[in-house]
């Protein structure tokens, strides 16, 4: 009986140690995320699973499970750069100050604190300068209703030379024009790469730095809809070329 009790205790200890290590890794080093929507296409596709580094921008309450309020501001902070793809807690009810965060979003930073951001007919303006974009191809997207949607693909080039692809359907959509906004201190302006299908800073406003969760780094697994556990579907749905792709 004593042996069985010791065996039970040792197994509980092993489980607790493993749980503590997992929480530390998830909170301080790296965390997996799943892409459920098309808002970051063509960079990130539905079904992509990626690793987000938690240390890239330092740490805040949102680095930890359930956003436990260990500290109010970020610590060991490193400023994000334009072009970074980031995961953040979407800000909600900021004016009422009742709850300042919601679900996890993933978007691209296009505006730093103090930047002047504007959109004119689908063209991004940063500090009164139009961001260079070059049309490189047209992709076809097959919709559930059987229709085919032509997606113009642009290469957007930032001032520092960083570039990435964006989708564009039209230049007169609901969010293709908005007046100048100066990004507040300690905040960032983010956009989805799928410009006509993204709920981003054009709708939820600038993102406070404390809401940043981490920087998207690499795609470690990708399917066309099946889960990791549905391994029997992998031969038909696994997107091999995307696995271990760096996120730029």
What is the predicted role of each segment?
Residues 2-9, 24, 28, 33, ...:
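Soluble "head" domains of membrane/secretory-pathway proteins
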